[in-house]
Amino acid sequence: MVGASSSYASPLCTWFVAACMSVSHGGGDSRQAVALQSGGRSRRRRQLSKCSVASGSASIQALVTSCLDFGPCTHYNNNNALSSLFGSNSVSLNRNQRRLNRAASSGGAMAVMEMEKEAAVNKKPPTEQRRVVVTGMGVETSLGHDPHTFYENLLQGNSGISQIENFDCSEFPTRIAGEIKSFSTEGWVAPKLSKRMDKFMLYLLTAGKKALADGGVTDEVMAEFDKTKCGVLIGSAMGGMKVFYDAIEALRISYKKMNPFCVPFATTNMGSAMLAMDLGWMGPNYSISTACATSNFCILNSANHIIKGEADVMLCGGSDAVIIPIGLGGFVACRALSQRNNDPTKASRPWDTNRDGFVMGEGAGVLLLEELEHAKKRGATIYAEFLGGSFTCDAYHMTEPHPDGAGVILCIERALASAGISKEQINYINAHATSTHAGDIKEYQALAHCFGQNPELKVNSTKSMIGHLLGAAGAVEAVATVQAIRTGWVHPNINLENPDSGVDTKLLVGPKKERLDIKAALSNSFGFGGHNSSIIFAPYK
């Protein structure tokens, strides 16, 4: 894992070197300056005159150092020429050797992170910066269809994991999930659309409109909004898999049997688009898909749109509905799922040695984010303030976390810097913790690295009760985080009976809910591809 400057500098150096070499000609040890076009400015001429290219790696190093003075870039593009940008020089290395090489470079990544920590002085954002607050929430989950019911079930330690009933899964080794048993779009989505849309879109539209209702945004209130500054950013990891699956089945008979809406209703962006069309909102509108980190990416980007003045109001979050044959089969093929079919409520077990995989869930979570003065002007109830967040990439493996937790640590450190708070101010963390050995342990180690022995800190995993909602996980867990701030109660970790070795259980919430006066709360979400995200909420003051 490298710092931000390296992540931008390395590709830039590659192209700059290629460009300079293409216009220069070298032989032996001679040096020739890059020629300028006849119309070039004198300042550019002086700058580019530094970019001399000679044969051998030393000249390339000089070029990188003189033209693009990025510390991490010169560190990773050293005398071994440019092959380090793309991988090992040896083509004979097998997969395991290549992965070991990547892990071996983690020391460099950690060094860059230390540089980041030294540079990131905790500073409060300028007073003139627009503040972002949460004024509404909507959910569709296996534990409830509104934030209050959902969180009350979490506080009671109730599990939403059960036998799958939506289709016959008797031939699958996994037959359990966090399936939503009773779902209705009545009053939220037109019946005609309900019959045609994928369930992920129905969850999204329903949760989005419920967030507006929860925020007191009636038709009369919305009439006062500047709709060019109202946006929707609700993502999905998998999109309309059921619509696509049904289209394939229809195509086996004839293309004439296919749903004419199968293409638009399968894309991940169409949910946000349909909600904006329904509301007439003309501000930022798109979707993000970063696997299980999707929701946090959407929430942070939405907040940034508000901070930059591009929007006053944003509906943001995530939605996924993949408890269907192709979705279940895909994760079974990955050997990622729990097979505790005879005791489904005990299947999701973050930080417990008796885990045997994660449990799929489904649903949607949507936050109504609003610029503070906009919210105050209309008399909105403010649930919490959004302080900041961060994204990073492990750049290591498709599904496994970085062995040093470098990407997660860097993400948390940057989130704290973005929020302008110290690590001591965080006393609640809603962890990603999916009930997989590698993921649970690496996240715990990253938290221990970042926060040390803070006796006030409490950590829990919402997934212990609802399973993993994939692209919707972060948003639903953000709702749980905001509810913890509002109520002063944090929900338990269920099924934590035999903690992993090295895990300090004093850090983790026990089997019962606990009272906690939250100063600031961190919510983590990580996704396949090494996507890391951390967002921070606090009580509004």
From Swiss-Prot:
Which positions, given as ranges, span the membrane? Answer: none
- Record CDD domains: KAS_I_II
Provide the tissue specificity: Mostly expressed in siliques, and, to a lower extent, in leaves, stems, flower buds, and flowers.
Q: Where in the cell is it found?
A: Plastid, Chloroplast stroma
Q: Name one GO molecular function term.
A: 3-oxoacyl-[acyl-carrier-protein] synthase activity
Reaction(s) catalysed (UniProt annotation): a fatty acyl-[ACP] + malonyl-[ACP] + H(+) = a 3-oxoacyl-[ACP] + holo-[ACP] + CO2
The answer on whether this UniProt entry bears the keyword Repressor reads no
**Phenotype seen when the gene is deleted:** Lethal when homozygous due to embryo abortion before the torpedo stage. Converts temperate oilseed composition (rich in unsaturated 18-carbon fatty acids) to that of a palm-like tropical oil (enriched in saturated 16-carbon fatty acids).
Function (record text)? Essential protein that catalyzes the condensation reaction of fatty acid synthesis by the addition to an acyl acceptor of two carbons from malonyl-ACP. Confers resistance to low temperatures by maintaining chloroplast membranes integrity. Involved in the regulation of fatty acids ratios during seed metabolism. Required for embryo development, especially at the transition from the globular to the heart stage.
Q: What is this protein called?
A: 3-oxoacyl-[acyl-carrier-protein] synthase II, chloroplastic
Which species does this protein come from? Answer: Arabidopsis thaliana
